[in-house]
Structures are given as C-alpha cells and as structure tokens.
Amino acid sequence: FTDFMKDIKLPAIVVADGRLGSINRAILTCEYAKMHGIEVKAIIVNDTTAVDPFLLKTNVADMERYTGIPVLAVVPPYQGPDIQKVQLGWARSFIDSKKLWNTVLGL
C-alpha cells in the first residue's frame, strides 16, 4: 500500500478506530506515512463501538495533539440494515465533504 500511495502522489486520510489503543495506532500510522514521504491531511475516527463518550472526545483531542493532523469526523457505529449503499450514505452524513476536500486540496 505504501508504494501505491507514493505512486499516485496524493495526500492520505487515515481512518482510525475509537477503541483502546487508537491513539497509538493513529500516531504510528501517521509517522509511518511521513517516514515514507506520504502526506496525511486528515484523520477520520470510525468504529466507536462501546467507547465512553468522554474517552472518545479525549482520544480525538489527543490524536490531533500528538499528530498535528486534524480529525475531520467521528463516525458512530452504524445501526441499520447491512446494505453498503445505505451505510455509505449514512457515513456521509457525519462528514463535512466541503471541509474534507478543502483539507485535502489545501484550500
């Protein structure tokens, strides 16, 4: 995957989970990308199943503080039918697409 990202020469968006160890995994992923010349523009936190709201809020703040990369969205667990099209539309409702593109394009 690293070679692919380097070949397409586009910035990355890291999708991190919100569970135990998520801060460490987000930091390691962002640092790995940086070491390989891949710019990470944003983090999206997904899979917040069974995460205490206070801990989730502090995890998001810590991810931003330790990586210096903004968290653009926190997507809560999906609770509907298991249909990809429905899930995608549902997830989009939590992501500010204008903010996402402005961040990726550096606007």
Language model features by range: what are they?
Residues F1-R19:
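Inter-motif core of Ras-like GTPase G domains
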Residues L20-S22, D52:
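Active-site glycine- and acidic-residue-rich loops that bind
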Residues E31-L107:
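C-terminal lobe/tail of nucleotide-utilizing enzymes
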